[in-house]
Structures are given as C-alpha cells and as structure tokens.
C-alpha cells in the first residue's frame, strides 16, 4: 500500500525556489517511487539527523521521515546537495 506524502511548510517553501524542471522531477518522484518504497529509494542518515532519510533527484536531495504507524512520508526539506545538510 502506498504511503501518503506530506510536505512541511519549510519543504513547500523550498519547492517554490526550485527551477521548473527540477520541481517537476521532485514532485513526480515524491508521489511515485518515494510513496511506494520510501525505505528502498532513500538512505538513513546518522548523528544529528538520525531518524531522517535522504533521497536523490539529480543534484538535489529530499530529506524525509517515515511514519509507519500512519503510512505517511513527511518531506522536511528539498534543496541542492551542497546546501541541504547545512541548516
């Protein structure tokens, strides 16, 4: 059963800053592969980001958490790989 995908306010703000081509790829990925298999398409992060996963879309990354109890993927941030881990 596919997971429900939700974007935080910060992630929505990040989406508005993306180039149109990247935005389309991120949205397609989020509601496609990510919603179907969130554990397979991302990798778990460590240290201060433990419990968070990172998935690639070209040179951009999506940071997300998985709520298995409610079958929901919550996308926390979307940004270029050089900037996403800095905040």
UniProtKB/Swiss-Prot annotation:
Protein family (similarity comment): Belongs to the RelE toxin family.
Protein name listed in UniProt: Toxin RelG
Keyword terms of this UniProt record: DNA-binding, Hydrolase, Nuclease, Repressor, Toxin-antitoxin system, Transcription, Transcription regulation
Species this chain originates from: Mycobacterium tuberculosis (strain ATCC 25618 / H37Rv)
Disrupted-gene phenotype: No visible phenotype in culture or upon infection of mice. Significantly fewer persister cells are generated in vitro following exposure to rifampicin and gentamicin, but in infected mice no differences are seen.
Keyword Transport annotated: no
EC number in record: 3.1.-.-
Gene coding for it: relG
Protein purpose: Toxic component of a type II toxin-antitoxin (TA) system. Has RNase activity and preferentially cleaves at the 3'-end of purine ribonucleotides. Overexpression in M.tuberculosis or M.smegmatis inhibits colony formation in a bacteriostatic rather than bacteriocidal fashion. Its toxic effect is neutralized by coexpression with cognate antitoxin RelB2 (shown only for M.smegmatis). Overexpression also increases the number of gentamicin-tolerant and levofloxacin-tolerant persister cells. In combination with cognate antitoxin RelF represses its own promoter. Has been seen to bind DNA in complex with antitoxin RelF but not alone.
KW Nuclease (keyword) present: yes
Gene Ontology molecular-function annotations: DNA binding; endonuclease activity
Pfam family, one: ParE_toxin
BP term (GO), one: negative regulation of DNA-templated transcription
Subunit structure comment from the entry: Interacts with cognate antitoxin RelF, which neutralizes the toxin. Also interacts with non-cognate antitoxin RelB in vitro, in M.smegmatis this neutralizes the toxicity of this toxin.
Induction: Expressed in log phase cells. Induced by treatment with rifampicin and gentamicin as well as by oxidative, nitrosative and nutritional stress. Induced in the lungs of mice infected for 4 weeks. A member of the relFG operon.
